[in-house]
Amino acid sequence: MNKEQLEKMKNGKGFIAALDQSGGSTPKALKEYGVNEDQYSNEDEMFQLVHDMRTRVVTSPSFSPDKILGAILFEQTMDREVESKYTADYLADKGVVPFLKVDKGLAEEQNGVQLMKPIDNLDNLLDRANERHIFGTKMRSNILELNEQGIKDVVEQQFEVAKQIIAKGLVPIIEPEVNINAKDKAEIEKVLKAELKKGLDSLNADQLVMLKLTIPTEPNLYKELAEHPNVVRVVVLSGGYSREKANELLKDNAELIASFSRALASDLRADQSKEEFDKALGDAVESIYDASVNKN
């Protein structure tokens, strides 16, 4: 583990850019960027276009290490290059800590939750991540209803896989998303917090994780988790809120910082000039940084 990167993730001012839309969500991400499905004829072309979009983001002067602590990449992005360097090396050289999305998507809903599908060849993927100088990983589950067994299952699965990731020298971001429209959202979050605390308490002193959570209904609910000795940082997802709304809610949570994807890229378009693109990205970065650093 890179100690300098660990220090930046633990104490740096800023947020994490989530650039990890994968196979299923790529056409949608491209469409929002202004690239329609008739502009590519196969998956290779599609992934090349999305890599071009991400390259444009990370090479922009607005993508500044003074504001952006880390970036989460999709496996395809890890294996591609930006300005003749592998993406993670490009980011690290710029001062941005690279993470890799490792999950293979969500299983069918059961007990009010969606567990992660089995991650085949995880060891192999983690070895490749180490070769590519990746610092940490990210994996997402989804909680839709107040079901204690389901929430327990989500957290147990996350910690089980997290321990495998830690054993390879990487820092896992555990992401049990709570659907923002869940009818008992506040109650779900209390159960989730208790289960996460159990999971954290089961770790050895040298087993470090990060958490990526939905912004809680009750402000500062996760403060105790952020202060847990095994937690490097707690980050939040935008989860379907607009950027303005997500930022507003984030400001009410003292220890949390953003890890936004759609809310970061929502104003970026393929046909923008360099100046327009850099300004749109810069405005987004500025507002998300502000919500992550300057609290109410």
UniProtKB/Swiss-Prot annotation:
Enzyme category, top tier: lyase
GO terms (BP aspect): glycolytic process
Active site residues per record: 175, 212
Catalyzed reactions: beta-D-fructose 1,6-bisphosphate = D-glyceraldehyde 3-phosphate + dihydroxyacetone phosphate
Pathway assignment: Carbohydrate degradation; glycolysis; D-glyceraldehyde 3-phosphate and glycerone phosphate from D-glucose: step 4/4
Lyase is among the record's keywords: yes
GO molecular function: fructose-bisphosphate aldolase activity
InterPro entries documented for this protein: Aldolase_TIM, FBA_I, FBA_I_Gram+-type
Keyword Lyase annotated: yes
Entry-linked Gene3D superfamilies: Aldolase class I
Record keywords: Glycolysis, Lyase, Schiff base
EC number: 4.1.2.13
Similarity section: Belongs to the class I fructose-bisphosphate aldolase family.
Listed name of the protein: Fructose-bisphosphate aldolase class 1
Organism (species): Staphylococcus aureus (strain COL)
Gene this chain is encoded by: fda
